[in-house]
Structures are given as structure tokens and as C-alpha cells.
């Protein structure tokens, strides 16, 4: 038997991945078991989708691949029904096993250009960046979008280092021809400033996953972001 027949990929369950949303006003929700507490992540994600979340990212650094796949299998029907992409953090193997819509990697994960070769040209590839140089490398590697942070400091990533503030985000948004999201400690009080700095949306964990009412929290973020986008457009 030829070796290539042993490693031939399984046929895809979904031939056309759901694309990354176009335009501005993106609310990008990242799962977190600690922020969820005793509540089921499936219930929280369902509520966020009802509230209008544009992207769901499956993130869990501390569980085996098998458990992450199981959670992804529970989330996929929810995101598919909503027409919203499901992106897997870091774990390319889990993303491929699920036939998820994309992968998000950080600076210490598998290099973005390698991930792009593995997942192919159609799936979403997100990259965490903190500098213009990192953002340019991500763009050259075939990234679909970049998330810039940690902006304000976040308990969800205690090893993230000191917050970088909004100026690096503004510089990246001016320089790189990719959608730019802000991430790191974003909430209703500061989301507008992220949009005014040039981001097309915000990536959040606690602001939605940890909220008493995730649906209402997602809707409230929408309202704040929409207002900030209007303000930015009027300012020229």
C-alpha cells in the first residue's frame, strides 16, 4: 500500500467554511470555563449568538484534545445554525478534527505560515499581535485578521504581560490591510475607545462569558460599538 493512501485526509463534513464577517462592529466571543463558572458553555454561547455574536472562538488551554473536541462538537450545531464561524484557539488538530471554520494562533504557537499551509486557503486564520512588525508578518503569512492586545489587562490570561494600551492598535490599524480586533480587558466601559482607535471589533471573554445575562451583554456591546463606529465615521 502506498504511504500517501494511509495519510489521505478524511473528506470534509462541511465543504465551505463560514467566512470571517466583513465590515465593522464585530463582537467576537471567546469561551472560557473559569469565566462560565457552573454554567454550561453551550448555554452561554447560545445566548451570545442570540445577542448577535459574529464569531465564536473555542479556547481551553488546560483540557485534553478529546475534551476540546467534545465541546467543539456541542458548539458546532449552534454556530452553524446561526451562520457564525467557529474558530479554534491554537489547536490545529482539533480544528481539523471538527472541520471548524478556522484557527487562531499566538506568537508562541505554531507559526502562522505553517498553519495556513495545513488548513488551506479557505479557512479563517487569526493571529494575536502586539506590534506593527508582528501584524505585517501575520499578513504576509496569510492571516485573515489580527487581534491586538493585551490592551487593558485581563484576568483571563495572567501570563499576557503588561497591557500595551491603544496606541499600538491604532498604529497597526493604520498600517496593515487586515481586519483588526482589540482584545484584553475589554468591557462596556472601554469598548468604544477600541473602535475609535481603529479596530473593526472587539474580542471578549469575561464581558460576555462571565456576564449574568450573556445575551444582553452581547447586545449592549453591539450598541456601544455601533455608536463608536458612527462617531468615527463622522470624524472622517
Curated annotation (Swiss-Prot):
Pathway, per record: Cofactor biosynthesis; thiamine diphosphate biosynthesis; thiamine phosphate from 4-amino-2-methyl-5-diphosphomethylpyrimidine and 4-methyl-5-(2-phosphoethyl)-thiazole: step 1/1
Keywords: Magnesium, Metal-binding, Thiamine biosynthesis, Transferase
The record's free-text note on cofactor binding: Binds 1 Mg(2+) ion per subunit.
Reactions accelerated catalytically: 2-[(2R,5Z)-2-carboxy-4-methylthiazol-5(2H)-ylidene]ethyl phosphate + 4-amino-2-methyl-5-(diphosphooxymethyl)pyrimidine + 2 H(+) = thiamine phosphate + CO2 + diphosphate; 2-(2-carboxy-4-methylthiazol-5-yl)ethyl phosphate + 4-amino-2-methyl-5-(diphosphooxymethyl)pyrimidine + 2 H(+) = thiamine phosphate + CO2 + diphosphate; 4-methyl-5-(2-phosphooxyethyl)-thiazole + 4-amino-2-methyl-5-(diphosphooxymethyl)pyrimidine + H(+) = thiamine phosphate + diphosphate
Record-linked CDD domains: TMP_TenI
Domain of life: Bacteria
A GO MF label: magnesium ion binding
Residues the entry annotates as binding 4-amino-2-methyl-5-(diphosphooxymethyl)pyrimidine: 57-61, 89, 128, 157
EC number: 2.5.1.3
Endpoints of the signal sequence: none
SUPFAM superfamilies: Thiamin phosphate synthase
GO cellular component, one term: cytoplasm
Entry-linked Gene3D superfamilies: Aldolase class I (3.20.20.70)
Family of the protein in this entry: Belongs to the thiamine-phosphate synthase family.
Function per UniProt: Condenses 4-methyl-5-(beta-hydroxyethyl)thiazole monophosphate (THZ-P) and 2-methyl-4-amino-5-hydroxymethyl pyrimidine pyrophosphate (HMP-PP) to form thiamine monophosphate (TMP).
HAMAP family: TMP_synthase
Protein name stated in the entry: Thiamine-phosphate synthase
Lineage: Bacteria, Bacillati, Chloroflexota, Chloroflexia, Chloroflexales
Gene name, Swiss-Prot/TrEMBL: thiE
Amino acid at each position: 500500500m502506498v504511504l500517501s493512501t494511509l495519510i489521505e485526509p478524511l473528506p470534509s463534513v462541511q465543504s465551505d467554511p463560514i467566512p470571517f464577517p466583513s465590515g465593522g462592529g464585530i463582537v467576537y466571543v471567546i469561551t472560557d470555563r473559569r469565566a462560565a463558572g457552573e454554567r454550561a458553555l453551550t448555554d452561554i454561547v447560545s445566548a451570545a449568538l442570540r445577542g448577535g455574536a459574529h464569531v465564536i472562538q473555542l479556547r481551553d488551554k488546560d483540557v485534553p484534545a478529546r475534551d476540546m473536541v467534545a465541546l467543539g462538537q456541542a458548539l458546532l450545531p449552534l454556530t452553524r445554525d446561526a451562520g457564525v464561524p467557529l474558530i479554534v484557539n491554537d489547536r490545529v488538530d482539533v480544528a481539523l478534527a471538527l472541520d471548524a471554520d478556522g484557527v487562531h494562533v499566538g506568537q508562541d504557537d505554531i507559526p502562522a505560515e505553517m498553519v495556513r499551509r495545513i488548513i488551506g486557503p479557505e479557512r479563517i486564520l487569526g493571529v494575536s499581535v502586539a506590534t506593527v512588525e508582528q501584524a505585517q508578518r501575520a499578513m504576509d503569512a496569510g492571516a485573515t485578521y489580527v487581534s491586538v492586545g493585551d490592551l487593558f489587562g485581563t484576568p483571563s490570561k495572567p501570563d499576557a504581560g503588561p497591557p500595551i494600551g491603544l496606541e499600538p492598535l491604532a498604529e497597526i490599524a493604520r498600517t496593515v490591510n487586515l481586519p483588526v480586533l482589540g482584545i484584553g480587558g475589554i468591557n462596556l466601559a472601554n469598548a468604544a475607545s477600541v473602535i475609535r482607535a481603529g479596530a473593526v471589533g472587539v474580542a471578549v471573554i469575561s464581558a460576555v462569558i462571565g456576564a449574568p445575562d450573556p445575551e444582553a451583554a452581547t447586545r449592549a456591546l453591539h450598541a456601544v460599538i455601533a455608536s463608536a463606529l458612527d462617531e468615527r465615521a463622522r470624524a472622517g
